[in-house]
Amino acid sequence: MDNKRKLLKELYMGRPIFQWGYSIALDFHYKEIIIDNETVSFQVSTNLLWNTHGSAFGDSKIYYRDVDCCVLCFGIHNEQSFNNLIYWIKELEANTLVDEKVPFVLIGTKSDIERTEKSISKERIEQWCKNKQKNSINISTLHHRMGY
């Protein structure tokens, strides 16, 4: 099971899950949590968690047209995965029906694998986020080691 699926399962089940079957074409999850005394609703399509590696994803536009937030995951050892982030930001912004800018949360996966000289540095990731924020892209980073 990849880290994106582990993250989603932990959100919905409240604890790490070690096995999860494959998602189907319209596999949606819904959860409400309380943040700062306010109820926040999550509706997540597991379709957006498939490993697309930056390739076109058919008619995925129908899945994110009404989004309020986007979680972008990339492998910290995969340059192409990191470079594809801007593609997905532009894709989402071009195809949402919401009037406001969509906030993004950036998650680097595969932190359980030892870093090499080809790994993307934390400093580079943070600089990338700062540059995007200057361009009015609302990006937050999540520094969390998936310790399963």
UniProtKB/Swiss-Prot annotation:
Q: Does the keyword Nucleotide-binding apply?
A: yes
GO molecular function, a single term = GTP binding
GO biological process: what's one of them?
A: phagosome-lysosome fusion
Q: Which InterPro entries is this protein grouped with?
A: P-loop_NTPase, Small_GTPase
Give the residues annotated as coiled coil: none
Positions bound to GTP: N51, T52, H53, G54, S55, T109, K110, S111, D112
Question: Which UniProt keywords are given for this protein, alphabetically ordered?
Answer: GTP-binding, Nucleotide-binding
Please tell me which stretches of this chain the record labels as motif Effector region.
21-28
**GO CC terms of this entry:** late endosome; lysosome; phagocytic vesicle
The entry sums up its family as follows: Belongs to the small GTPase superfamily. Rab family.
Q: What is this protein called?
A: Ras-related protein RabK3
